[in-house]
A protein has these predicted regions:
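Hydrophobic transmembrane alpha-helices and immediately adjacent juxtamembrane helices
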Residues: 1-180
């Protein structure tokens, strides 16, 4: 176990650079850049609130908060696992040239999506304040479930990345599975 921790520590700078690269690549050639991580959840929440609020006749003022919180969590898991699935295969050229622990690629994918997810949580906090749910100390309890979500996403992502190396169709199957 100590050897694995030492290996991880030795490659921490590479992990940091891979996370930075992932964020930059996600928003390159985009006029708004990382602002999309704030705008996209807002626009999706508005559409879903109008559609489902009208469809179900929901008049609860906190309904958009429920929609946004569920959507942000699911979106992070889906994006994190999708990008992890392709991460080892997309970096195969570097893996063949230089020894790097292969788990760094799925981990960096999960981490950069987690950072984007944390930025998106700003929208959730603002919507909570707007709907009258002001931040309290209880909001800090969200840290543990988010850590569990991060670990679960990494676990699923590394399994999918391993399968994705040998079975390229897994990318399409996983996209379908996420829609279920």
């Amino acid at each position: 176990m100590k050897k694995r921790i030492d290996t991880f520590w030795r490659y921490r700078n590479l992990l940091f650079e891979l996370v930075k690269k992932g964020i930059k690549l996600k928003y390159r050639r985009s006029y708004l850049g990382i602002i999309w991580s704030l705008l996209e959840p807002v626009m999706t929440t508005i559409v879903l609130t109008i559609v489902f609020g009208t469809l179900y006749g929901n008049k609860d003022h906190t309904f958009p908060l429920y929609i946004l919180s569920g959507r942000l969590l699911y979106s992070y898991f889906a994006q994190g696992t999708k990008v992890s699935l392709k991460s080892i295969r997309q970096n195969s050229a570097m893996i063949k040239k230089v020894y790097v622990p292969k788990y760094l690629y799925p981990l960096s994918s999960v981490l950069y999506n987690f950072i984007i997810f944390l930025i998106s949580l700003i929208v959730l906090v603002l919507l909570g304040i707007f709907t009258g749910n002001y931040p309290t100390l209880h909001w800090l309890l969200i840290a543990f479930p988010l850590l569990v979500l991060l670990i679960m996403t990494f676990g699923v992502g590394i399994i999918l990345a391993t399968i994705g190396v040998f079975f390229r169709d897994m990318e399409y199957l996983w996209s379908v599975a996420l829609m279920l």
